[in-house]
């Protein structure tokens, strides 16, 4: 059995330790104090209540993925999130909304994961054809730059389901 963890690095929950909108974790989150060690992870338009969120869901504040503090915490520190779980035996990560992560972030993540375990899997959630994906006016290099080992193949999944249900007369599989 292999253990693949779901890495959500584009946003956090509004009630996470890092944001703590409901003050569940003692009020040290970015929503509670500008002195929070996590404050720079987020973009506030008018602190605290007006902030950038994933697809405008206020329960999912977006993270500044390339902020040095976030990079250290997630990837590069000795006991970063990635290193911690890899050392405990995780066999890799599935990247939630990989198309919303900068290529540079994915490259750093891959270097760290493969540095700990060269056989670890880095799998991306990409809803469209990942080989031709353009996100934020930029062609993604998931495969051409070797960023990801694989992706969730939703177009193929849809074709199989449509075929089994008899919805496309087999066109998707030709």
Model-identified regions with their sequence ranges:
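Short, acidic/polar
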Residues: 67-87
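A residue-identity detector for tryptophan
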Residues: 41, 47, 54-55, 70, ...
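Active-site cleft segment of glycoside hydrolase catalytic domains centered on the general acid/base Glu
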Residues: 51-71, 98, 102-110
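Glycine-rich, aromatic-flanked loop segments that form ligand/cofactor-binding clefts
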Residues: 1-12, 32-44, 123
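Core domains of carbohydrate- and sulfate-ester-processing enzymes
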Residues: 17-64, 157-174
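Active-site-proximal helices and loops of the catalytic beta/alpha 8
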Residues: 10-11, 16-26, 81-83, 91-174
């Amino acid at each position: 059995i292999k253990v693949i963890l779901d890495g959500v690095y584009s946003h956090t929950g509004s009630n996470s330790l890092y944001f703590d909108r409901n003050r569940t974790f003692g009020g040290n989150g970015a929503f509670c104090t500008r002195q929070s060690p996590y404050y720079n992870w987020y973009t506030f338009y008018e602190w605290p209540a007006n902030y950038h969120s994933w697809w405008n869901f206020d329960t999912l504040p977006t993270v500044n993925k390339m902020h040095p503090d976030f990079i250290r915490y997630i990837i590069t520190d000795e006991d970063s999130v990635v290193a911690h779980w890899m050392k405990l035996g995780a066999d890799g990560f599935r990247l939630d909304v990989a198309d919303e992560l900068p290529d540079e972030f994915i490259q750093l993540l891959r270097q760290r994961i493969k540095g700990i375990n060269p056989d670890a899997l880095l799998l991306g959630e990409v809803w469209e054809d990942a080989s031709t994906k353009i996100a934020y006016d930029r062609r993604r290099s998931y495969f051409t730059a070797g960023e990801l080992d694989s992706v969730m193949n939703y177009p193929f999944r849809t074709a199989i389901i449509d075929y089994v249900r008899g919805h496309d007369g087999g066109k998707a599989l030709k």
